[in-house]
């Protein structure tokens, strides 16, 4: 088996995904005791893992540094990359939502100002609804934007809704459901076809058996 390099997202999604790899027989012990390391070798397979920021996973896969990547659908929707999206892993499930303070009126004809970390997704969503909105990109916590009057509402990923609730915001629209996706480098799918499809097929069977 030729070596397969897999790029994973550091943080919350990583914790959802590691058990899936373990369930298909891939040793992930180094990942679970990583310290400050960012590159890890599976002890029982020719598979190595790299841990990178979520926004960089698709970039590493697109440029062939990683053969396979696992990343949230939000990253793929916001950043168009020349990769193959192969499998919905069904973990890390969240929703894109429009949220604001209780006095927000989503039916108002006035041009709205929306704060978000995801300007591309937000622009497409409101464009498809026929609404002209001003979009302000914010890198940090967007919840504060409608509270301080910077924006009428926000578009953000909501998992439990606890952060919104703690800041006095409510969900007005659920836009899209998102989850972790397995992506593959286009060239690698040709040169390492058997190895990659072996991982994908085992993962797919594991997901189906768990439903």
UniProtKB/Swiss-Prot annotation:
Keyword NADP set for record: no
Keyword Metal-binding applies: no
Gene Ontology, cellular component aspect: cytoplasm
Biochemical pathway: Amino-acid biosynthesis; L-histidine biosynthesis; L-histidine from 5-phospho-alpha-D-ribose 1-diphosphate: step 1/9
Subcellular localization(s) per the UniProt record: Cytoplasm
An example Gene Ontology molecular-function term: ATP phosphoribosyltransferase activity
GO biological process: L-histidine biosynthetic process
EC number: 2.4.2.17
Keywords of the record: Amino-acid biosynthesis, ATP-binding, Cytoplasm, Glycosyltransferase, Histidine biosynthesis, Nucleotide-binding, Transferase
Disulfide bonds: none
Entry's family note: Belongs to the ATP phosphoribosyltransferase family. Short subfamily.
Domain commentary: Lacks the C-terminal regulatory region which is replaced by HisZ.
Alphabetical list of PANTHER family matching this protein: ATP PHOSPHORIBOSYLTRANSFERASE, ATP PHOSPHORIBOSYLTRANSFERASE ATP-PRTASE
Quaternary structure annotation from Swiss-Prot or TrEMBL: Heteromultimer composed of HisG and HisZ subunits.
Function: Catalyzes the condensation of ATP and 5-phosphoribose 1-diphosphate to form N'-(5'-phosphoribosyl)-ATP (PR-ATP). Has a crucial role in the pathway because the rate of histidine biosynthesis seems to be controlled primarily by regulation of HisG enzymatic activity.
Entry-linked NCBIfam families: hisG
Name of the protein described by the UniProt record: ATP phosphoribosyltransferase
Organism expressing this protein natively: Bacillus anthracis
